[in-house]
Swiss-Prot record:
Keywords of the record: Host cell membrane, Host cytoplasm, Host membrane, Host nucleus, Host-virus interaction, Membrane, Viral matrix protein, Virion
UniProt-annotated location(s): Virion; Host cytoplasm; Host nucleus; Host cell membrane
Mode of membrane association: Peripheral membrane protein
GO MF, any single term: structural constituent of virion
Organism: Murine pneumonia virus (strain 15) (MPV)
Source species taxonomy: Viruses, Riboviria, Orthornavirae, Negarnaviricota, Haploviricotina
Protein name (database record): Matrix protein
Keyword Membrane recorded: yes
UniProt gene name: M
Any one GO BP annotation for this protein: virion assembly
Listed InterPro entries: Matrix_Pneumo_C, MATRX_N_pneumovirus, Pneu_matrix_N
């Protein structure tokens, strides 16, 4: 079983974001990507990795008003992971591989093929993009374009990420654009793609100027990128993707006017 650790924070307590790649225990006809709701812990990181090896996984596909969902039940004989959620729902369309097919209301036992633990800051220092306080009458959108380089294939690529909506008066537009091309360059110091909910972009913030004034200095922004692990392996994302820089776009909002 492959196990990976992505460290974006080195203190305690910390938030653990765990993603499991699963295969059906008895026939290997079904594979799933499952992400455990984030939980906060002060356990040594290596202990969390060791304890996850012994977790057993049962998944059941169910029908809900929100569409097909996977009910995940985790169990462990060790009490060390007391803060880890043991039962939760995830979107079946994202979790199931294209070739996988689960019957409804039939519990299925799974083996762990690989897993990844991403270490993030405490929960009060984490922001997901949808949770950032909305702006009244937004006129513009702040987009972060994070550049990455694959050290094996030597290919470079950009990932654009919506950060937040802004209200900017026309007479102040020039000064805001100048800030985005200068000051904000120092606000985002590092970015990394981590396997969670498919893939998640983790951005570290060190400044609260301008567009980032609603965020705490030292916080982390999490932006979900979607279920791309069918095309990209855990090993490739963690070992070979290197963040090379971030640029910013101020886009006129479609709701402005």
């Amino acid at each position: 079983m492959e196990a990976y650790l992505v460290e974006m924070y080195h203190g305690v307590p910390y938030t653990a974001a765990v993603q499991l790649n699963l295969v059906e225990k008895h026939s290997a006809n079904i594979s799933l990507t499952v992400w455990i709701p984030m939980f906060q812990t002060s356990l040594p990181k290596n202990s969390v990795m060791d304890l996850l090896h012994d977790v057993t996984v049962i998944c059941t596909q169910i029908s809900t008003v929100h569409g097909p969902m996977i009910k995940v039940d985790l169990s462990s004989s060790n009490a060390g992971l007391a803060t880890m959620p043991r039962q939760f729902l995830i979107n079946a369309i994202i979790a199931l591989d294209d070739w996988g097919n689960m019957d409804y209301e039939v519990p299925v036992a799974f083996d762990k093929k690989s897993f990844c633990v991403t270490i993030l800051k405490p929960k009060n220092m984490l922001y997901t993009v949808p949770s950032i306080t909305p702006t009244n009458r937004p006129t513009h959108e702040l987009i972060a374009v994070c550049s990455f380089h694959n050290r094996v294939t030597l290919k470079s690529f950009n990932i654009p990420v919506f950060i937040r909506a802004l209200y900017i008066r026309q007479q102040g537009l020039d000064s805001v654009e100048q800030a985005i091309s200068s000051d904000v360059d120092h606000a985002i110091t590092t970015a990394r793609v981590a396997p969670y909910a498919g893939l998640t972009l983790v951005i570290n913030i060190t400044s609260t100027k301008g567009a980032f004034k609603l965020l705490k200095a030292g916080s982390q922004i999490l932006a979900e990128l979607g279920p791309y692990l069918t095309q990209v392996s855990l090993h490739d994302v963690i070992m070979n993707w290197k963040h090379t820089g971030t640029s910013y776009i101020l886009k006129s909002s479609s709701t402005s006017g």
